[in-house]
Amino acid sequence: MRSLWLLVFSFSVLTGTNMAFPMILSERPEVTGSFKVKDTSLTHLTVHRKTGEVFVGAINRVYKLSANLTETRSHQTGPVEDNAKCYPPPSVRACTQKLESTDNVNKLLLVDYAGNRLVACGSIWQGVCQFLRLEDLFKLGEPHHRKEHYLSGAKESDGMAGVVVGDDDGDLKKKKKGGSRLFIGAAIDGKSEYFPTLSSRKLVADEESVNMFSLVYQDEFVSSQIKIPSDTLSQYPAFDIYYVYGFSSRTYIYFLTLQLDTQLTQVDVTGEKFFTSKIVRMCSNDTEFYSYVEFPLGCTKDGVEYRLVQAAYKHRPGKILAQALGLSEDEDVLFVIFSQGQKNRANPPRETVLCLFTLHQINLAMRERIKSCYRGEGKLSLPWLLNKELPCINTPKQIGDDFCGLVLNQPLGGLMVIEGIPLFDDRTDGMASVAAYTYGDHSVVFVGTRSGHLKKIRVNGVPPPSENALLYETVTVVEGSPILRDMVFSPDYQYIYLLSDKQVSRLPVESCSQYSSCKTCLGSGDPHCGWCVLHNKCSRKEACEKWAEPLHFSTELKQCVDITVTPDNMSVTSVSTQLSVKVANVPNLSAGVTCVFEELTESPGEVLAEGQILCMSPSLRDVPSVTQGYGDKRVVKLSLKSKETGLKFITTDFVFYNCSVLQSCSSCVSSPFPCNWCKYRHICTNNVAECSFQEGRVSSAEGCPQILPSSDILVPAGIVRPITLRARNLPQPQSGQKNYECVFNIQGKVQRIPAVRFNSSCIQCQNTSYWYEGNEMGDLPVDFSIVWDGDFPIDKPSSMRALLYKCEAQRDSCGLCLKADSTFECGWCLADKKCLLKQHCPSAEHNWMHQGRRNIRCSHPRITKIRPLTGPKEGGTRVTIEGENLGLQVREITHVRVAGVRCNPAAAEYISAERIVCDMEESLMSSPPGGPVELCIGDCSAEYRTQSTQTYSFVMPSFSRVRPEKGPVSGGTRLTISGRHLDAGSAVTVFLAQEECLFVRRTVREIVCVTPPSASGSGPSSVKLFIDKAEITSDTRYIYTEDPNISTIEPNWSIINGSTSLTVTGTNLLTIQEPKVRAKYGGVETTNICSLVNDSVMTCLAPGIIYTKREAPESGVHPDEFGFILDHVSALLILNGTPFTYYPNPTFEPLGNAGILEVKPGSPIILKGKNLIPPAPGNIRLNYSVTIGETPCLLTVSESQLLCDSPDLTGEQRVMILVGGLEYSPGMLHIYSDSTLTLPAIIGIGAGGGVLLIAIIAVLIAYKRKTRDADRTLKRLQLQMDNLESRVALECKEAFAELQTDIQELTNDMDGVKIPFLEYRTYTMRVMFPGIEEHPVLKELDSPANVEKALRLFSQLLHNKMFLLTFIHTLEAQRSFSMRDRGNVASLLMAALQGRMEYATVVLKQLLADLIEKNLENRNHPKLLLRRTESVAEKMLTNWFTFLLHRFLKECAGEPLFMLYCAIKQQMEKGPIDAITGEARYSLSEDKLIRQQIDYKQLTLMCIPPEGEAGTEIPVKVLNCDTITQVKDKLLDAVYKGIPYSQRPQADDMDLEWRQGRLTRIILQDEDVTTKIESDWKRLNTLAHYQVTDGSLVALVQKQVSAYNIANSFTFTRSLSRYESLLRTSSSPDSLRSRAPMITPDQETGTKLWHLVKNHEHADQREGDRGSKMVSEIYLTRLLATKGTLQKFVDDLFETVFSTAHRGSALPLAIKYMFDFLDEQADKRQITDPDVRHTWKSNCLPLRFWVNVIKNPQFVFDIHKNSITDACLSVVAQTFMDSCSTSEHRLGKDSPSNKLLYAKDIPNYKSWVERYYRDISKMPSISDQDMDAYLVEQSRLHGNEFNTLSALSELYFYINKYKEEILTALDRDGYCRKHKLRHKLEQAINLMSGSS
C-alpha cells in the first residue's frame, strides 16, 4: 500500500480533571498573551505547525494572529443576505424566501498544508467554505455554485469535524492532479436530502475549480458519502450526528460523534431525548465507504455511567504510560472527556470524567465485530440506517488489520459499548476540552473547563495503581467563561493556546518558577519541573546550567538538599562560635561557599570532606539587638551561598535565644533552651556563673516556688478571717529582703495584706475583711497573687481564683436563700427575714434555716404571674406559675387547681422555689367559669397555701377567614387566619388538609403560619386548628394553585454590584407574597427584592455578587446559581436555562487635579470612566443619574465617558453619580461666573457712576428724544448679542456631543448592507460615455452588406499599429478636434479593441511615449503630463484602467467606497436637508452647509410597504422638517434596503398615505391647498406642517391620477421639476455653489418656493431678519463634527487604495505594469527628479481613475447620488488629490474650508501614497508575456460586451469628417505608403459612400 501522509485537524479539543496530589491553584497571572473581541464570538482555533501563527474562526470573521496573539490580519466572512430555506443559496439562484442579514458562524477551520491555504467553513449559503491565503487571509476562492460545495447550513459551531489526507508519494504529476482529500463529518439539521452526514471530498489546487469539494468517488450506485435516511428523520425529527473530533491513525480515519439514541428515545417529539457517543472508523483510502464501522463508546466510574462525549485528543503515550498499558510508544491512545448520563446534549451536566482508550483496544473490538459479521453472525445493527435489521452474510474472507470492507456487510454497527479507563473525574467545574503531549517519559494532559480554568494532569498509569492520574495544577484562564474544544500547542510545545467565547489565551505549558523551594517544586507533581540546586530555582532541566552533571539537577523529593547545623541555637550573650554544617545531595562545592545569617553577617565557609562545612556564628557586637521585639527567641535563616553562582542554594533555621526576657520561674525552666531560674534574684539566665546554688539556682519545674492548686477560695464579704494556702519551695527572705504579701484587686482597688510564711509549703494571709460595692451580684471573682520582697510574684495556677460573696445579695426570699451553693454556708434568718451567715442571725439555733436541716420548708408562698390567662375547656393547656417560696422540691407541690380545674405539675419544667409548670385537665362543665390559681406547699395549712391575684378564663376559639385565599402548590405562603380568642391556650397547630402549617406567631385575633407543600396538588384544602386539646374547624378553604413559572428575564445581565432593574415575565406570579431574586457566586448567596406588577410581570433589582479578585473580566462572569426565591417554589431557585452575566462595575476617574474641576456655568462636563456600557447584547443600557449639588443634569453616555450639562449654578458643587446602587463622587466642580470685579470695586464704581450720572442727566435733558431712541437701539443690540452668544454656545456643544455619539451609531447602521455593483458593461459605459444611457455601441448595427464589409476593412486598418497611430495623431492635429471629440474617440477605440486588449495596450504605451516626448519638446513642465485630457492617450489610459481594475473594485476597493457613500448619505439624512437649495445640517462642504439653527425632531413612522399587508409595518426614522418627497425617499430606502436603485419604485411614482384609523386616509403632498404662502414665498409642506406624530402609521401606494391629484399637484410638479433635474444629475459639478438652483418666481403665480432657508441673496430678504441670524461661520464647527463621524470610512478607503496588500487581494497587474512603464520612460529621458515620477504616477492612476470613481460612485454601483452627497464626495476627492501632490500646502485662515478640514490628515495620507509607490517599485517586474496572457484572458472574459461594428461605425464619422487630412498623412508616412494603407482606406470609404 502506498505511503500516506495524514494531516489531521480537529475542531474539538478535549478536557479532563482529577484529584490526587497537593494540587496548586495558580492565582498569579499565568496568561502570557491574549486576544480579545467584543463584537463577535469566537468558535475555532488552529495553529500553523511550522510558523506557529494562530488562526481563529469567529462569527463573521477569521483572524490571523502572531504567535504572541497580536492581530496581524482579519477577514470578514459575513453577515450576508441569506435565508436558511434557500437552496441553492441566493448567491446562485434567486430565492422566493425573504432574505435577511445572516451571521456566518465558523464551523470548521483547518490548514491545508499541501495547498498552503486556510479552509474556513461557515453556516451561510448552506455551509460553503472559503479558501484563504495563509500569508494575508486574501480570499483565494469561495466555491458556492454546485451542490457539492454545500457542506451543511446548521448553525451550531461545534457539530463539524474534518480530517485532511494528502498524497506524499513523490509523483508530482499525480499529486498536482489529485491534490488532498478532506474527510468531513457534519451535523445536517434535518436536511438529509441536501447534505451527507459524512463524506470524502477533493481538495484541488485551483480554489475556483469545478472539482473543488467534489466527492472522491461517485457513480450511479455508490459514492464517497453516507446520508441519514429520510425515514429515520421522519420517525425521529431531532435525529442528527454531531461530530466532536476527527483524527487519523496509521491507515484509518476516525470520528468521535454524539447522536440521538433511537433505542432509548421515544418516537414522540415532546418526549425526553437520550444521546449516545460513538466512534466511527474508515480506511483512509476507501473511496466507496465500504469500511464504515461505528461502535458505542463510554466510561464508567464508581458505578456511574458517563455517555456524553465532550471532547477528545489523540496522543502517543510517554514511556511510563506505554509500559503501564503494555503498548509500544508509537501506538496511539485516545483521551476522551464524557459528561454524566445521556441527556442534555446542549447543556450537559458538569459531572465529567477523563477516560483513556487505546486504539489497539478499539481496532480489536471492530475487527472481531467484522469477523463475526463475515461469519454470518448477527445483523448490521446500525440503529439509524434503514438496513439495520439486515442479517450479516456469511462470506469466507481473511480479515486482517488492512481489511477495508466489501460491497456487502456494510455499513456495520457495534452493539457492545467500548469502555474506556477512567482516569479523573470532576463534579463541579465541568471539563470541556482536552489536549495532551509527552514530556520526557511522562504523558501530560491539559483540560479546559466550563468555569474558565485549565487543569494540568499527569497520566503515568492506569488503575489499579492509585497514582493513575495526578491533577497537579489548576490555572484560571477566563473566570466563568467556558473553554471551547479547540486547544492547540505551539509547534515547540512551550505554550498552549486556549479559546473561549471572547478571548484567545496563550499559557506556558509549565510554570515551574512559581515554586520557591525544592520540596514544593518536586512535590508539585509537574513533570516539567526539577530543582536546579546551585541556582536555587525550580525550572525545566534545559534551563539549568550543568544539569547533566551529578547532583546539579534534582527530579525526586529524596534528592532535595538536606542540611543540619550543630549547634542549632545560641544565646544572644554568647561570643562567636564555630558551627558545623552538614549538607547532603549537593554537587561539588570546590568553588567555595559563604555562610550568611540573614542581614546580620556573611562569612566564608570552610569546605571539608563528605559535605561538611565550618561556619562562624555572628560576633557578640553583631547580635545584641537581634531578639529585641521578638520575645525570648528569634529564628534567623542561615544560608549557604555558592561562590560558583553567587546564589544561596540551601537555607535552614538558626535560633538566637534570650533567657532574661522570661519573668517567671516556670516559664524559665520549661524553656527549650538552657535557661536557669535564680530564685533569690528573681531572674532567668543561661549563664550558670551568674546564679550559684547559694543564690537559689533552679533548673526544673519541681524546684520552682509555687502556690499549689486548690478549689476556689471562698471569702464572705465583711467577715474578718485569715486565708491559708498550700505551697512548695517558698524561699525564706534573706536579710534586706521584704516579707510576703497577699495582693487582691477588688473592683479596680488593690488591697495588700501581710502574709506569714509558716514553712516552705504553707503561707497565710493575715486576718482582715474584704468588701465589694453593690448587691447586683451574689458573688464576685477577684484577682489575687502572692508576692515577696516587694514585687516578686510566686507562681500560681492560672485557673486559681478567689470568690468574694454576700449571702443577702440577690437572695431576698427564703426559697432563693436556701437554693444557694451549700459551700457559701448561707441560711434564712427568720427573725430578720434575710439570708445571712449563721453568726449574723440572732438566736441562730432557732431562727436560722439552712440546707443541712431535714424537712425544711419555706412558708408563705406567693404567686406573682400566671400564663396563659385563657384556654379551652377541653384542657391540655400548659400553665406556667411564677412566684416565690414555691417549694424546694417538686414533690412538695400539691393541690394545684386553675379556675377550679385540676392541673398536674410537670417535674421536668419545675424550677425550685421560683416556677411551677402544670398541664390542665378537661373541665367537665359546659360553660366553666374562670377563677384564680390555688396551690399548697407540703400541706394546705394557711401559711403554706396561696392564691393568685390573676384569674384564668375558659374561652371558645373560632376562625372565619384566611388570607391570602390561594398560594402555590409548593407552599411557603404566609397564611393569616382571622378569628376570636386565637391566643388562648399554650400550643397551637394549624393543618391544611393533612399537612401542618408552620406556626409563626399569633394574637387574640389572628394566627400566622407558613403553608406546607400540597400533597394532593392544586385545588382547595380544608383548614383546621388544634389549640391544646381543642379542635376548631370552619367552612373556610385555602386554594392551592399551580406554582409560578419564569419565562424571561430582561435584561439577562447586571453589574457586579447588582441593583439594576430587571423585568421578569412568567405565570401565576401574584400568588407570591415576597418575591426575591437570588444569585450565588463563590459559595456566597446574595438576594434582592422584587415588586409584582401583575400576574405575569414583576420587576426586580438584580442581586450583586461578592467578587474577590482584583477586577472582573470585560466579558463578564457567570454566577454559579441564579434564580428566584418565590415562597417555597424550589424549582425556580436555580434557573440553569437562563444564563445570567455580571459585568464589571463602572468606575470613574477623579475630576481635574485633586478632584476639583473649574468650569463656567452651562459648560459641558466630561466624566471619564471605564465599563460604562457593558458589552451585553440588546439595546438595554445602565441607567445613570448625575447630580451637581442637588441638581440633576442631562446625560449623554458613551463607552468611556458621560457628557453632562452643568446647571446654572455657581460656587463649589459636589458631583454625584448613581448607577446600579453604586454612588461615586469623582470630585467637586468649581463653577465660576465671568464677573471679576470685587465688592469694593463694584461699590467704588457705583459711587463714581452716581456722581457722573448726576452730571450727565443735566446734559441729557436737552437731548431727551434722541437719547431715548439710542437707548432703545442699544438694548435691542444687547439682547441680540446675548441671544447670539447663547446660541453659539449651544451650537458648539451640540457639535461636540454629536461627534461623540454619531460614529458608533453610523458604524452599526452600515453593518450587513449588500453592495449593488453594476454589471461590467454598465460600469464601463458610465465611465467611457458619462450621461449617455443608450449608446450605439450597445446595439446591433442594422446596415447593408457593403457597409458591414467596409467597416470590417476599417477594422483591419485599425488593427495595424501604424495606421492607428497616424489616424490618432492626425485627428489631434486638427483645430476643430475638440476635447470632447478626443474623449469620444478614445472610448470608441477601447470599445472596438475590447477583444484585443493586448494590442490596445501596445498602442496605448506608444501614444503615451509620444505624449511624453511631445511634452518635453514643447518645454512644458514634466509634472503637467497626464494632468488634463488634452489627448486621446489620456482618455484611453482612463478607460484602460477602468477595464482592468473592475475585478479589484468588486473584490476589494468597492466595499470601502460603498461604505463611504452609505455613511455620507446616512449622516446627511440624520439632519435637515433643504429640498430646494440642497444645503444640509451635516456636510463636509462649506457651500452646502445650512448656516442657520433649524429646530427639528426625529420621528419613527410605521410604514406599510407597497402591496404590504397590515402587520408588515417597517419602522423608519424621519425628521419632522422633511418634505413629503424626502419622507418618501427615506421610506423607499428602508423598504427596499439592499435592492439596486434602478429596480425599485421612485418617489414620484408613489403617494404617501397617512392612516389615522380604519377609514381615515390622508394623502400627503409637497404642495396642496394647505400650503402656507407668506408674501411671495411658498413653503413646501413637511411632516410638521401636517402635524404627523411619532409612531404614526403611513403607507406607500401607487400614485393615482385623479382630478384631486391633478388639481393639487400640477403647480408643484411643474415648479419643482427644474430643481429635481439639477439635484438628481449623475455627473459631478465644476462648481458646487453654481449648482444651487436659484429661486425664481413661478411663471403663473409669481411665488417663490422655499423649504428650510430662503435664499439670502434674494432682493427681498428683509433686513430685520438679520437680528435673528447667527454669525454663519459659527456653523463651520459642524463640518468638523461631520468629518469626525466619517473619518473611519475615509481612512478605510484611502488605506485600501494606497496599500499593496489590499486586505488580501494581490496588487492588480495593470498598476504595476503601467508604473514600471512610466519609470522606464523617465529613465529613458534621464528624468531623475523623484517628484516628477511621483506626479506622473499620481496623474496616471489616482487622478485619472480613482478621483473619477470617488466623485461618481454611481459609475460603480446601482445607486442614486443627490447633490449634498455629491458635494461631500467632491471634498473627499479633493483631499485624495491633495494627498497625491508633492507640493507643500500652505494654509491660513483664508484657505478654503475643505483644505483646512483635512489639513492634519493630508501629511499622513501623503506618507501612505509615497509608501505605496515605493512598495510597487520594489515588487518584481511583470514580463510582457505574463501581461499579454493576462490581457488575453480579460479579452476572453469581456470581448463581447460591446458591438464592435457599431463602435467602428461611430469612429468612421471622424474618418469621414477629416478624410483629406488622414489620406494626406498616410501618403506622407513611408510605412503606410509601403503597405498601401491609403488605398485600403479609400476602398473602405468607397464602400461606405456606395451605401449612401
UniProtKB/Swiss-Prot annotation:
One term under GO cellular component: membrane
Glycosylated residues, chain numbering: 68, 569, 1183
Record membrane topology: Single-pass type I membrane protein
Localization per record: Cell membrane
Transmembrane segments: 1241-1261
Single GO biological process annotation from the record: regulation of collateral sprouting in absence of injury
Keywords: Cell membrane, Coiled coil, Disulfide bond, Glycoprotein, Membrane, Receptor, Repeat, Signal, Transmembrane, Transmembrane helix
Main location: membrane
Tissues in which the protein is found: Detected in primary motor neurons in the embryonic nervous system.
Extracellular side of membrane: 21-1240
Domain Sema: 21-509
Disulfide bonds: 86-95, 121-129, 283-404, 299-355, 373-392, 512-529, 518-560, 521-538, 532-544, 595-615
Pfam families linked to this entry: Plexin_cytopl (PF08337), Plexin_RBD (PF20170), PSI (PF01437), PSI_PlexinA-B (PF24479), Sema (PF01403), TIG (PF01833), TIG_2 (PF18020), TIG_plexin (PF17960)
Coiled-coil stretches: 1262-1315
Residue ranges that the UniProt entry lists as topological domain Cytoplasmic: 1262-1892
Domain IPT/TIG: 861-955, 957-1041, 1044-1143, 1146-1232
Span of the signal peptide: 1-20
Keyword Repeat: yes
Any one GO molecular function term: identical protein binding
Family: Belongs to the plexin family.
Biological function: Coreceptor for class 3 semaphorins. Necessary for signaling by class 3 semaphorins and subsequent remodeling of the cytoskeleton. Plays a role in axon guidance in the developing nervous system. Class 3 semaphorins bind to a complex composed of a neuropilin and a plexin. The plexin modulates the affinity of the complex for specific semaphorins, and its cytoplasmic domain is required for the activation of down-stream signaling events in the cytoplasm.
Name of protein: Plexin A3
